[in-house]
Amino acid sequence: MCNCKKNIKVDESYVSFKDIDCFENACLVIDNLLRILKEPKNTNAYWEKFIEKIPEAYYTRDSKKDPSEALLYLVCSCTSNIMELFEEIDDEEAIDAMSKCEQECC
C-alpha cells in the first residue's frame, strides 16, 4: 500500500469524462444497430433478445429515465458482438459510432 499523500479532489476524479455525453454515444450505437437489424438477414435470436433489453430511456431519448445507465451498460457489455456485426456488414458509420462510444465511455 502506498503511503503517498496525494490529495485528489472529488471534482477532479472524472475530468476525462467532462463534456462527453455517454448516453447519446450509446444511443447512436443503438440507432445504427437497429438500422442494420431491420434487414432480416442480419438478425438472429441473439439480437432479438438484445433488442428486448434496450431500456425505455433510449426510445424517449431521456437520460434522466436511465439513472443506472442501463443503456450504456448494455452497449459496453456487448461491444465485441456489436462491433463484429458492424464490421461484418462493413458499415463505417456504425463502426465509428461504436468506436467512439467504446473509447470515450466504456
From Swiss-Prot:
NCBIfam families to which the protein is assigned, alphabetical: N2Fix_CO_CowN (NF033689)
HAMAP family attached to this UniProt entry: CowN (MF_02117)
Record organism: Denitrovibrio acetiphilus (strain DSM 12809 / NBRC 114555 / N2460)
Protein name (database record): N(2)-fixation sustaining protein CowN
This protein's UniProt keywords: Nitrogen fixation
Gene Ontology biological process: nitrogen fixation
Record family assignment: Belongs to the CowN family.
Matching InterPro entries: CowN (IPR024899)
